[in-house]
Amino acid sequence: MSSNQPRQTWSNRLTYILTVAGATVGFGATWRFPYLVGENGGGAYVFLFCIAMLVIGIPMILVENVIGRRKGVNALDAFGGTMNGKPVAKVWKLVGWMGLHGAFGIMAYYMVLGGWVISYIINIIGGNLDISSPVSGEVTKSFFTEHIENSPWEIAFYTFLFVVVNQWILVKGVIGGIEKAAKYLMPLLFLFLIAMVVRNVTLPGAMEGITFYLKPDFSKITAELFVFVLGQVFFALSLGFGVMITLSSYLDKNENLVQTAVITAITNTLIAVLAGFMIFPSLFSFGVAPNSGPTLVFQSLPIVFSNMWAGPVFAVIFFSLLLIAALTTSLTIYEVLITTIQEKTKIRRAAAITIVLAGIFIFGNIPSILSYGPWKDISVFGKNIFDAFDYISGNILFMLTALGSALFVGFVMKDEAKEELLYKGNHTTVNIWFAYVKYLVPLVILLIFVSNLF
């Protein structure tokens, strides 16, 4: 511990699960998962995603939970101190540093997506995006170009507004702020999600979309696709940038880590699958292509809503759902950096929050916003700044942090890692998990890493 004060713990298992679920759903489940399903064979992708949760998802949740609870400190110091009575080599701190940089990278563009969503909500309510009657793809594309790509100051304002909402919750602390927010926001998210699913699966022609979504076309399943899906699980579960390590550092020592890991994976998968039920039946009902990629939510779905009874109302509900998912995730990613700065420097929490939020807004959010306008000609690795943040954090830093975490558990923590699970676990099961994490998981992560780069 970095403080003489005992560390807070979550009020109960339910609030921890809700907080972790909020950390993992975000845009990964509500935006990224559906468009990747549409691009990669529908049911085939869903089938592989469920397999990937078992192969890499649950084992890696346990890796980060074991590190976090055992060390009980921030995501940087978790890779330091002593283990098994011996000092941990300082080189392991590099794993923590990569995770922190990954957290910065994802927040650099993630908050901007939140700004986009707020823009859609306000413009739909205000009538600037009029979907009260059927519109074409040209209309939604024109709106995206005018109000998202070519309106940097408008998006900067909405992004700043989203940052302020995060700040208002974060100043209340981990338990009083993040936990309490998850306690109310996650049930609201489920309510909105169920309402949208019920509405869309009852549309005429919805069954065609459900079939596309649930019936795997095994001819589309390839080794390359499976490796790709394995990589997406890291994004879906917020693995590799310190979120699970930070959140589990507040876990009670009596909590069953295996059960919480399984529940976390099931909850994330359930929300992602429900998001698909919310989207694909409506796409097929109104003849909109499901494989429109990242623009699916922002350009294709408004066409669907414009053809739907009470479309603007359901559109506002949908984008509000996205905003809630983004908020519950952004709070926990911010917390990774806030906890680290607060514990390393001993400054007040309010000061740490200001440093993190202002720093990311100035050096991450603003460049990401400008990359669609005045800075569109600036490229990093052949990508604009917005996409470069995504690529570097998602394909490089997350993978290397996850690899380092697995190796840290297997070769540094060793018996201490097993002890965290043996209290509530079976010896045989724990030994199998440990061997799997020590030898096989690093190979899987290396395979994903190389595949992402080449």
Regions flagged by a language model, labelled:
Residues 2-3, 114-146, 250-254, 259, ...:
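Helix-loop-helix connectors at the membrane interface of multi-pass transporters/channels
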Residues 9-20, 45-48, 89-104, 156-160, ...:
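Select transmembrane alpha-helical segments in multipass membrane proteins
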Residues 15-52, 245-248, 258-262, 266-269:
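Transmembrane helix-boundary motif of multi-pass solute transporters/channels
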Residues 15-17, 23, 156-157, 267-273, ...:
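Loop-to-transmembrane helix boundary motifs in multi-pass membrane proteins
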